[in-house]
Amino acid sequence: MKRIGTLVLVLVLMSGFAFAQGSNEKTETANSTVKTLRVAMECGYAPYNWTQTDDSNGAVPIADSNDYAYGYDVMMAKLIAEKLGYKLQVVKLDWDSLVPAVQSGSVDCVIAGQSITSDRLQMVDFTTPYYYASIICLTNKDSKFASAKGISDLAGGTCTSQLGTVWYDTCLPQISHAKILPAQESAPAMLVALNSKRVDFICTDMPTAQAAIIAYPTMKILDFTSTNDDFKVSQEDINIGVSVSKKNPELTKAINGVLATLTVDDFNAMMDKAISVQPLSK
C-alpha cells in the first residue's frame, strides 16, 4: 500500500510540474509575440520631450541608457503603443538624425514635435496632426524689442532659432534687415543664446516658449498670431505629426486610427500637463 501511495504522489507531482511548465511556456510565447514600437525623439526639447533620471510621472527608459524620457511626445507615444498593443522603446537621437533613422528602418517612427512640411513629406510619411503649434518669438523683458506688436517691430534685430526648423528657415527671413546668426543645434541651445543676450530674440513655437518662461522668468513671449503683422506660414508649418517610413503605410494608418479618437482639447490638456511637470517647472 505504501508503494502504491508513493507512486500516486509521484504521479501527482509530475503532473503538476508538467502543467506549470506548460503554463510558463505559454506565458513566454505570449510575451514573445508582443511587438516593440521604436520611437525616436531628441529627449531634450521640453515640453515635447526631455531626459530625466527617474521614472517619475510615468517616464519611460531611454534605450541603451540609464536615463528616462518624458514629455508630451512620450505621453503620446505611450498612448499609441498601448492602443496598438506594442511595447514602447524610446530611442534618443539628435534632431538631424531623426528622419534618416526612419528612412533606414532603425526606428519605426519619430514623435518629436516635427512640423509636417512638404520637404519632409518627400522623405517620410506623416500621420494626421497630434498637435497644432502656433509660431511666436521670445525676447528678454529688458530688451528694446519687448514691446513689439508685430514682426515689423523686430526689424534690425539679432536673432536665431533651431537648426532644420521652419522657425529658422521660413520665419526669421521674413523680418526686415534681421541679423540672423547661425542656427542652433537644439532648443536648449537657442534658449541659452537668448538668455546670454547673444541675440535679441528667437523664433519658436508656443509650447516651447511656455516651457521656456518657466525656466527663464526674465523672458517674454511675443505673440503676433492675432494680428496682421505676423509670420506668413502655411498650415503644414504649424501641424505637428508622427513621421513614419514610406515603406510602412500600415503603421501610419494604425497611428491615425488612434489619433482619430482624440480631440484638440485632449491635445491641449496633455500639453498643459507636460508643461506643468517638466523638470525646470519645479
Region annotations inferred by a language model:
Residues 85-87, 103-112, 157-159, 195-208, ...:
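Alpha-to-beta junction loops
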Residues 96-97, 113-123, 170-174, 200-236:
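A ligand-binding cleft/hinge motif common to bilobed small-molecule-binding domains
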Residues 43-46, 66-83, 114, 136-191, ...:
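Bilobed "Venus flytrap"/periplasmic-binding protein-like clamshell domains
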Residues 132-139, 214-259, 277-282:
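Periplasmic-binding protein-like
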Residues 30-114:
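Extracytoplasmic small-molecule ligand-binding "clamshell" domains
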Residues 1-36, 282:
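Short, low-complexity disordered leader/linker segments with a strong preference
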Residues 82, 87-153, 227, 232-235:
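Acidic, polar ligand-binding/catalytic clefts
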Residues 166-185, 221-223, 253-282:
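Ligand-binding clefts/hinges and TM-proximal coupling segments of bilobed small-molecule sensing domains
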